[in-house]
C-alpha cells in the first residue's frame, strides 16, 4: 500500500510516524503502513456468499449458501486471539460481509477488544437501517468497491444498477457519519474511467480511495490479458499522481493510495527527485519505514472456513486453520517453508529472480507481489511481472 497523497502531496512527515514510536497499537490508522512491529492487519473473509458476481473476484463468490463458515462464537474466538496478539485492525470482507446477520455483533466485539473494525463491501445492501447499526457498533471505515462509472462498473459486477445501489449505500453511511472510501481495481476495461472516478470523489465528498493493481487470483486469474501493459501502468500511475495533486491544490485533501504494486513507491520517489529533491529525501525515509510488500508479515487473511493465508490472494495455500490452532500460533510458526520465506524473502528472491536480484529498490519494495510471480512463472520467488520500472531505473546494469 503506497500513500500517494501522503507522499506526493506532503501530508505526512517521517516525524509523524516516529512520534508514536512506530507502534502499530498506537499509530493512527492513516500511519499504520509505517509501523515498525508490522503486527498483521487481518482480512477475515467471513463469508463466501455475495449478491453480485464480479469478474475479478479473488474469492470466486456466489449468491448461494456455503457450508463450513466460521460461526459467531468461532469468530469471537478469532477476534480474542487477534486482539491479544496485537493485530490493530480486522477487515471484515467476503464475499459480501453485509450478508452475514452477525456482522454488527462481531464488529462490536472487535471494538470491545480494542481493535479497529472496518469492512470491504460492494455497498449495494447497505440501507439506512444497516448504516445506523454499523455506526452504533463503532465501525471505523466502510470501503465500497466501484470499478468504473455506471455501465463499466455494472458490467464488472454482473448486475445492472449495481453502481447506483453502491452509491446509495455509500450515502447512507455518510449520513450516519461513518468514514467511507472507494476501492477501484485497475485494468484495460476501466482505466479510462479514472478521471471520472476522481470527479466522483470531489462531487460526493468521498475522502479516500484505493486504486488496486490487478492480482491474478480467483476469477482474476482469468484476467491476465486484461491487465495493463507496463507502459500503461506507468501512465495510469502518472494520471493518479496528477489528479491527486490537483485535488489537493483545489482544497479537497482526499487520501489516495495505490495497492498491490510496490514499485509505485520508487517510481514516485524518482519523480519527486526531479520536482522537489528536499521532499524526495523525506519520501525515501517514509518508503523505508513502509518496507514494501507485507504479505505474510503485516497483512494476513482468514477464510470463511478458518484457513489462514498470507493475504487474501493466496487462497490456494493455507498455513493452517484457526479451528485447529490460534492464528497467532500459525502466524509465528516458521516450520512452514513459505511462511518462513515470506518473512525473510530477500535471499530467496536474490537466488531465483533476475531483475529483483539486481534491483536497488529491493529494500523499499520487498520484491513486490509474490503471488503474481507464481501465477505467471510458477515460481514464488521469481520477478513480479507487473513491475514497470526499466532496467535503468532499477540499476540493473550497476549491480
Curated annotation (Swiss-Prot):
It holds the Pfam family Radical_SAM. InterPro entries: 4Fe4S-binding_SPASM_dom (IPR023885), Ahb_Proteobacteria (IPR030894), AhbC-like (IPR034479), Aldolase_TIM (IPR013785), Elp3/MiaA/NifB-like_rSAM (IPR006638), PqqE-like (IPR017200), Radical_SAM_PqqE_MftC-like (IPR050377), rSAM (IPR007197). CDD domains: Radical_SAM, SPASM_MftC-like. Gene3D superfamilies: Aldolase class I (3.20.20.70). Coiled coil: none annotated. Residues 36-253 form the Radical SAM core domain. [4Fe-4S] cluster binds at residues 50, 54, 57. Transmembrane segments: none annotated. Its cofactor is [4Fe-4S] cluster. Belongs to the radical SAM superfamily. It is an enzyme of class 4 (lyase). Involved in siroheme-dependent heme b biosynthesis. Catalyzes the conversion of didecarboxysiroheme into Fe-coproporphyrin III by oxidative loss of two acetic acid side chains. One of its GO terms (biological process) is heme biosynthetic process. This is Fe-coproporphyrin III synthase. Keywords: 4Fe-4S, Heme biosynthesis, Iron, Iron-sulfur, Lyase, Metal-binding, S-adenosyl-L-methionine. Pathway: Porphyrin-containing compound metabolism; protoheme biosynthesis. Its EC number is 4.1.3.-. It catalyses: 12,18-didecarboxysiroheme + 2 AH2 + 2 S-adenosyl-L-methionine = Fe-coproporphyrin III + 2 5'-deoxyadenosine + 2 L-methionine + 2 acetate + 2 A + 2 H(+). GO terms for molecular function: 4 iron, 4 sulfur cluster binding; lyase activity; metal ion binding.
